[in-house]
């Protein structure tokens, strides 16, 4: 089974050295984007995608979703639990406004999570993060 390791080192370099995200701390939405905060988010997002999301891709490919005659749908093994952890971790709300339950972080922090989900070949990444489009 393929193993996915999120490129956290490269991501930290881009955020801290290239974008210098901390230099925008005086702008709305950037107040909490300190190097410590962004490093912690990058590390945990990488861990979550590498350890929780990537391993269930195989069951998704093999099992797929099943629609039952009563209209209910069963997802592949591990998907329900992974989604629960995704929601509880607040991963879909990183860059959403606090007024709508978001974390008010710069949009780039949400994009990092999207990048990790997509690069782990997670077929549901576009559905998981579509809520930011509704709020924007």
Set out the residue ranges of the language-model regions:
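Single conserved hydrophobic/aromatic residue that forms the stacking wall/gate
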Residues: 128-136
């Amino acid at each position: 089974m393929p193993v996915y390791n999120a490129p956290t080192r490269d991501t930290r370099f881009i955020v801290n050295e290239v974008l210098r995200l901390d230099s925008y701390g005086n702008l709305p939405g950037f107040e909490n984007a300190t190097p410590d905060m962004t490093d912690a988010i990058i590390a945990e997002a990488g861990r979550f995608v590498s350890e929780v999301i990537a391993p269930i891709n195989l069951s998704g490919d093999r099992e797929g979703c099943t629609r039952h005659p009563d209209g209910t749908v069963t997802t592949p093994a591990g998907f329900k639990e992974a989604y629960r952890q995704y929601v509880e971790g607040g991963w879909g709300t990183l860059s959403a406004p606090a007024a709508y339950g978001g974390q008010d972080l710069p949009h780039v922090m949400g994009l990092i999570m999207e990048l990790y989900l997509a690069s782990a070949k997670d077929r549901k990444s576009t559905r998981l993060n579509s809520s930011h489009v509704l709020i924007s």
